[in-house]
Amino acid sequence: MSVKIRLQRHGKKGKPFYWVVAADARSKRDGKYLEKIGTYNPNTNPATVELNLDSAVKWLHNGAQPTDTARAILSYKGALLKHHLDGGVRKGALTQEQADAKLTAWLEAKAGKVDAKKDGLSKAQADAKAKALKAEKEVNDKRIAAAAKAEADAIAAASATEEAATEEVAEAAEEAPAAEENNETTEA
């Protein structure tokens, strides 16, 4: 029986979530599988991969062929390296302790790279948030200054119209007695 290590799709439309499974090569994409090896979530950044390393290496030893994406996932988690190092142990080129030391060193280096990427992404996100907040504060300050200027202009215009109205009332008051005098002279 030909066995493949491949992805089995789960999740909903537009939000894929995959199981990494060992399945018969003739079975359907989402059909029966022999063993679930792990999960792969491409929706997160960086993608989340959980893998049972020993189970994956066991299937590789038994001759399972990974698909292209599954091969990339196995390589990312170190399953292919462990399979390669186990081959060296079987041939006598390495001892098991040396192989384990190489694998743990590689896994630690890989974890450091992944953590650095996560830190970089969180720092970039925080910087973008701070920059957006600064831009929003500048816009708010401009808006407040424009509102204060408009209010001051409105007050100045109101006081100018008030002064003009008082001047008109004063002129009207001066004209009214003059008009009354004119009326008295015309009656006489």
Swiss-Prot record:
Coiled coil: none
CC terms in the record's Gene Ontology section: cytoplasm; small ribosomal subunit
Keywords: Ribonucleoprotein, Ribosomal protein
Region (Disordered): 155-188
UniProt feature, compositional bias: Acidic residues: 164-188
GO BP field: translation
InterPro entries linked to this entry: Ribosomal_bS16, Ribosomal_bS16_dom_sf
Signal peptide: none
GO function terms (MF aspect): structural constituent of ribosome
Family: Belongs to the bacterial ribosomal protein bS16 family.
Protein name, as recorded: Small ribosomal subunit protein bS16
Organism: Flavobacterium johnsoniae (strain ATCC 17061 / DSM 2064 / JCM 8514 / BCRC 14874 / CCUG 350202 / NBRC 14942 / NCIMB 11054 / UW101)
Name of the coding gene: rpsP
